Design a protein with these regions (language model features):
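C-terminal/domain-terminus segments
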Residues: 17, 114-131, 182
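N-terminal intrinsically disordered/low-complexity leader segments
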Residues: 1-5
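Alpha-helical DNA-contacting segments of helix-turn-helix folds
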Residues: 56-65
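Hydrophobic/aromatic-rich alpha-helical bundle segments in the mid-to-C-terminal region
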Residues: 113, 141-182
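Hydrophobic alpha-helical connector segments
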Residues: 57, 71-103
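Helix-turn-helix
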Residues: 11, 15, 19-53, 57
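Amphipathic alpha-helical packing segments from all-alpha helical-bundle domains
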Residues: 95, 99-106, 121-147, 158-165
Length: 182
């Protein structure tokens, strides 16, 4: 097996990030990335398998970690009894959301790719995955606190999905528009 040249991997990632940010996944060219990185497309295929693998290498660490943290927050909250959940919901949510925002802004280039340039990748529906997690745990919360709208059928699955999606879209819209954390 041929020895890989030191620094090429990092350089390819740097050039790929720029290419994907400028053109999006669908229009990005491995040839252009290889040229900018001073390597060959074969070198990229050896390291990343394909364009999707290269995109994944850029976004998965941050995307996976945010999802892991989000699930951990949900799980830890749902360890509380129903009364504690009801009493602590606002405070707990605000604190957790602040931590997630901090993480997103610490990994802003990755989330810009994920939110603005992922069409055509396995990450194109990343927000939908977060929405499904939130909807699932919202139902658990409603059961734990005996939320009457859920019990009486006034809150449909479709309405909850719409409201949750709009909340997530509004949160991530600030990233799409390049707004600073301050």
């Amino acid at each position: 097996m041929a020895k890989q040249i030191e620094g090429v991997y990092e350089n390819v990632l740097r050039c790929a990030r720029q290419e994907f940010l400028e053109k999006g996944f669908a229009l990005a060219s491995l040839r252009d990335i290889a040229k900018a990185a001073g390597t060959s497309t074969g070198s990229i295929y050896t390291r990343f398998t394909d364009k999707a693998g290269l995109f994944r290498a850029l976004v998965e660490p941050a995307a996976g970690e945010l999802k892991r943290r989000f699930l951990e927050i949900q799980e830890s909250f749902h360890q509380f009894d129903g009364q504690t959940q009801q009493e602590e919901m606002g405070r707990y949510t605000a604190h957790a959301q602040e931590g997630l925002f901090d993480y997103i802004y610490e990994h802003l280039p990755e989330f810009e790719l994920l939110l603005r340039r992922a069409a055509g990748t396995e990450y194109a529906h990343y927000i939908d995955e977060l929405v499904e997690i939130e909807v699932s745990y919202t139902y658990k919360y409603m059961e734990a606190v005996g939320y009457p709208a859920r019990m009486e059928g006034a809150l449909t699955e479709q309405l909850l999905h719409i409201v949750t999606t709009s909340r997530f879209e509004s949160i991530f819209e600030v990233i799409r528009h390049g707004m600073s954390r301050a």
